[in-house]
């Protein structure tokens, strides 16, 4: 069955491509020269570690990792326990409070429990220099994450893609909307959330789609590992 394929199966060849090796080398060289890069090396590929290809039900595309101390840990929009919840994620929580009965905003921004349920929290660029947004945007990560999206499109069926903002929507242009469920809205950033992210109902619609397919819906209440 297709959904038994792993990321290793489908990405092993891509990871040998010269552009990808160059990307890794550039990041490694910057780290070795004393530049602070987020997330830490061990966390760069956490999106794939926590959500195996065969388990992907929902894809949420981010853009850049957070560039503040201790924030980024390899999952889009998520921050480590003990770190203040960033504004875009607070707006996601606000939308959840307004649309999911019983949802109460957690006091943390750690989304591993989403990832463990099949929500691929994928940034389109996987590293960033401290304090410098988009500083690694041209290193080759976009090529790699384009490939990831095309592989999900090809090997999975019925995945919900939540595309927030123009960057994610351009990135998701290759998705076959006959084969997958594509939902679009403005970005949850405070700059754009009031233009239609609030009220988009995406978290509810994603679960309705999954239930129609006979799949377990996502429990959108983020739970810290010690609580689960």
Curated annotation (Swiss-Prot):
It holds the Pfam family UDG. GO terms for molecular function: uracil DNA N-glycosylase activity. PROSITE patterns: U_DNA_GLYCOSYLASE (PS00130). Keywords: Cytoplasm, DNA damage, DNA repair, Hydrolase. It is found in: Cytoplasm. Its EC number is 3.2.2.27. It catalyses: Hydrolyzes single-stranded DNA or mismatched double-stranded DNA and polynucleotides, releasing free uracil. Excises uracil residues from the DNA which can arise as a result of misincorporation of dUMP residues by DNA polymerase or due to deamination of cytosine. Monomer. Belongs to the uracil-DNA glycosylase (UDG) superfamily. UNG family. This is Uracil-DNA glycosylase. It comes from Escherichia coli O6:H1 (strain CFT073 / ATCC 700928 / UPEC). The lineage of its organism: Bacteria, Pseudomonadati, Pseudomonadota, Gammaproteobacteria, Enterobacterales.
């Amino acid at each position: 069955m297709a959904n038994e394929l792993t990321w290793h199966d489908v990405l092993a060849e891509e990871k040998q491509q010269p552009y990808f090796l160059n990307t890794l080398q550039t990041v490694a060289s910057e780290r070795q020269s004393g530049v602070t890069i987020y997330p830490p090396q061990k966390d760069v590929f956490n999106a794939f570690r926590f959500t195996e290809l065969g388990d992907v039900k929902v894809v949420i595309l981010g853009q850049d990792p957070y560039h503040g101390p201790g924030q980024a840990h390899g999952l889009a929009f998520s921050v480590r326990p003990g770190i203040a919840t960033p504004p875009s994620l607070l707006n996601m929580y606000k939308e959840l409070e307004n649309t999911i009965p019983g949802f109460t905003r957690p006091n943390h921004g750690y989304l591993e429990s989403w990832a463990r349920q099949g929500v691929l929290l994928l940034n389109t660029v996987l590293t960033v220099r401290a304090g410098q947004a988009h500083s690694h945007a041209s290193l080759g990560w976009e090529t790699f994450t384009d490939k990831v999206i095309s592989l999900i499109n090809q090997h999975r069926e019925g995945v919900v893609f939540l595309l927030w903002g123009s960057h994610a929507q351009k990135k998701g242009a290759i998705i076959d909307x006959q084969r997958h469920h594509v939902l679009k809205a403005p970005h949850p950033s405070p700059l754009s959330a009031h233009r239609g992210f609030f009220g988009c109902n995406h978290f509810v619609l994603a679960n309705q789609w999954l239930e129609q397919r006979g799949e377990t819906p996502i429990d959108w209440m983020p739970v810290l590992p010690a609580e689960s």
